[in-house]
Every structure is written in structure tokens, then in C-alpha cells.
């Protein structure tokens, strides 16, 4: 999660390059564990070049409703509308009504959700600390952990040899029946992503299986 100071430093770099436009995906703006959400769109000298992408999937737990939006300068928004209008015929009326209710309603359900995610984050970090070889920073937002797993590269369980994060993810899926995502999808090939958007019971079971599967690698 970027701090305001970090965003300001980036903004000052972009100030020197007026040809650059900034696309900022802020879908997790309400799922913060440390401080308030900060947007790069807050800097007036950049606001005409920022395309802010958001939606209702994360902060309002409306993943299945499939409704997102952008906030941008009118010229950019109109150009996007020309393309988007040819891709879909429009959001359904019931989805639009639900979105209005979410965006104009109180934030207590979201606050309760973040409180629960905070508890899960704490437990997940405890579970990771008990798995030899996993190294993980505590996430400041969203509902994922991103542990380093490169200590397992080159190891095998007798049948499978792990050479990268992609293979480790397949190993965990096939041997532990736990689904993870390779860090190479996010530009970090030494990590894997694990979601804790699940029940505490399933989190406990999942990490127990991960621990057992990784312990078989030598």
C-alpha cells in the first residue's frame, strides 16, 4: 500500500513527463489495515492525466455483480465510453440499483468485513511463521499474502522437482489440494499469492496442508 509521501514522490516524477498517463487501480481502497487509502488522483497537477479504475467487487463484496467504473478527465472518459459501449450493452438495471444502494449506504458492513479480514490476516501470519522456508511481509491491505518461496526451488518429494514458483503452485494444487497463484503473474517470480478471503476453518486446513506438502520437499 502506497503512503501519501510515496505517491507524492511518484507524482513529482510524473510532473516532469507530461506525456505520461497514469492508470490507478484502486479496487481495494476500503480494505486497508494500516491508515487511510491514498490516491494519486489527489494531486491537482496530475488529475487530468489520472485514470482511476474502481468497482464494487472488493469493498462491497459484490464480485458476482460485475460492475466497475473509471474516474477520468471527460475527454478520456468519452473515449473509453466509445470502446466499452461496443463491448457490452450496459449493466443490468438491478445491478445499477444495487450499486446505488452500496455507494450511498453506510459503510458499517464494509467496516465489519475489514475487521474480520484483520483477524484472518493475523492468524495467517502466525501460520506462515510456523512453516519453515516461507518468508512473508505482513500485508497492509487487500486479502492476500505474498510469501517468498524460492527456498524450495531445486527441492523434490521423490516424484516432483520444484524449479520455480509456477511448479510449486502446481505441486500444492496436486499434492495438497490448495490453490495458489504464482508470483510470476505479478512480476515477482520468487513468490506465490495466497488468499485469505475464506473462512477461518478453511484457512487453518489450507495452511496445514501447505505445511505438510512443503515438509515433504528436500
Q: Residue spans of the language-model regions?
A:
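PLP-dependent class I/II
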Residues: 1-218
Amino acid at each position: 500500500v502506497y503512503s501519501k509521501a510515496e505517491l507524492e514522490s511518484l507524482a513529482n516524477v510524473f510532473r516532469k513527463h507530461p506525456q505520461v498517463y497514469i492508470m490507478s487501480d484502486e479496487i481495494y481502497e476500503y480494505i486497508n489495515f494500516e491508515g487511510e487509502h491514498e490516491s494519486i488522483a489527489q494531486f491537482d497537477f496530475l488529475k487530468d492525466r489520472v485514470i482511476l479504475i474502481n468497482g464494487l467487487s472488493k469493498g462491497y463484496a459484490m464480485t458476482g455483480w460485475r460492475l466497475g467504473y473509471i474516474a477520468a478527465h471527460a475527454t478520456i472518459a468519452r473515449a473509453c465510453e466509445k470502446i466499452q459501449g461496443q463491448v457490452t450493452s450496459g449493466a443490468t438495471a438491478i445491478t445499477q440499483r444495487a450499486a446505488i444502494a452500496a455507494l450511498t449506504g453506510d459503510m458499517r458492513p464494509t467496516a465489519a468485513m475489514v475487521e474480520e479480514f484483520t483477524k484472518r490476516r493475523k492468524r495467517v501470519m502466525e501460520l506462515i511463521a510456523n512453516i519453515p522456508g516461507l518468508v512473508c511481509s505482513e500485508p497492509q491491505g487487500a486479502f492476500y499474502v505474498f510469501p517468498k518461496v524460492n527456498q524450495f526451488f531445486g527441492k523434490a518429494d521423490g516424484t516432483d522437482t520444484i524449479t520455480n514458483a509456477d511448479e510449486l503452485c502446481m505441486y500444492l494444487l496436486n499434492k495438497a489440494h490448495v490453490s495458489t497463484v504464482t508470483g510470476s503473474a505479478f512480476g515477482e517470480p520468487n513468490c506465490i499469492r495466497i488468499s485469505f478471503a475464506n473462512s477461518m476453518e478453511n484457512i487453518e486446513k489450507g495452511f496445514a496442508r501447505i505445511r505438510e506438502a512443503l515438509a515433504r520437499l528436500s
